[in-house]
Amino acid sequence: MRAVIALAMMLSGALPAWADNSPAPENQQIAGLIRTPLMLPVTLANGQPALLEAFVTRPANNDPAPVALITNGTADTASFDRFVMNPNRYASTAIAFARHGYAAVVVLRQGYGQSSGAAEYAGGSCAQPHHQLAGERDRDTLLAALKAIRQQPWASPKQAVLVGMSSGGFAMLATGAANPPGVQAIINFDGGRGALDGKSFCDQPGLLKALTDYGKRTTIPSLWLYAANDRAFPPAAAKAMFSAYQKDGAPVKFVAMPAFGENGHTFMDSAPEAFWWKPVANFLQQQALPYQPIAELPQTQLPVPSVLNDEGRKAFQEYAASQRYEKAFAIDAQGDWGVSYWARTRDEAAESALGYCAKQQEAGKAGCHLYTINNEVVPEQTVQR
């Protein structure tokens, strides 16, 4: 049997305004947590306004919680960054922090998803990637985001953690070099810029120079986690960046993570919490920040569809175990299947899973139907494609 996995969704309609903090019923919720999509209006350092696509996942109360500000990486193409990227791609990371007591806010920087403006790499090239300038642009965006978030009653004005992967990890190191008041830790998942094939880089000397500058200026402790099979920044490259950052005594710890999947570069957004939380928890504890769970992960007992072959059963078991917002699984009577992760809404997840299942069918066969949306089995809804 054949199947296609849809890992991202195209843009759709507008999101709720920042002022609307009530969870929308069509958005998946987890017991003990509140999740709300956001459009975050901010004012940049130059006085210009910007609008950032985001969502918050936080404990189900209005007590001020430490902020975990989480930001995105960069894809291979600008079209993906703009038209496919959405905050739910980092849902598993946000859920992990929220269930340990944080107001976890995923913010897409300018130029990504429905955020306004141009990406930090706009105007650059591999010959001239402008690493330092990119860091400055991202720093200004993220500092503005943190300021706006701290105006909310559920956000602590005195405690925050900066979290990012890939280019987002680099962005958080740049932000940390400004030593924002109340930021107590930086967590860098496979961070960097300008990777080509894991062996060559766009202006690697410039990248190392920027990291040396950030390390020299920061007083904030940081944790660096890099997977053994990171295809963008393999161990030698990761160690070179770490050495540059640590050169002048920056308070930083490096953790070599095990291999994950085919490319460990994406483990922050793809690996289960159990893969990476222990070293993060140890680091947070050392900074006197929350690290113990306040909400349990949902225990899903979804029956595996009997029509699936071994490949399909494995995919469904991974689906059932994954803690991600807005996902769906579709099947037909012959065992064709399609799965969608990282959609903006449950309707988009359903449509995508159905579409990819239908593409695998032989002509004349009965249509695919949704089997699950998020963590619930749904009544059969046959859709002819």
Show where each model-derived region lies.
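N-terminal cap/lid segment of alpha/beta-hydrolase-fold proteins
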Residues: 20-62
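Short substrate-entry loop that stabilizes the transition state in hydrolases
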Residues: 63-65, 73-116, 195-196, 231-234
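The conserved beta1-alpha1 loop
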Residues: 71-73, 226
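Alpha/beta-hydrolase active-site loop
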Residues: 124-153
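Primarily recognizes the serine-hydrolase "nucleophile elbow" in alpha/beta-hydrolase
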Residues: 142-209
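The feature captures the conserved acid-bearing segment of alpha/beta-hydrolase catalytic domains
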Residues: 185, 191-249, 253
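Secreted/extracellular ectodomain signature
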Residues: 221, 253-254, 269, 273, ...
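Catalytic histidine-centered segment of alpha/beta-hydrolase-like enzymes
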Residues: 260-272
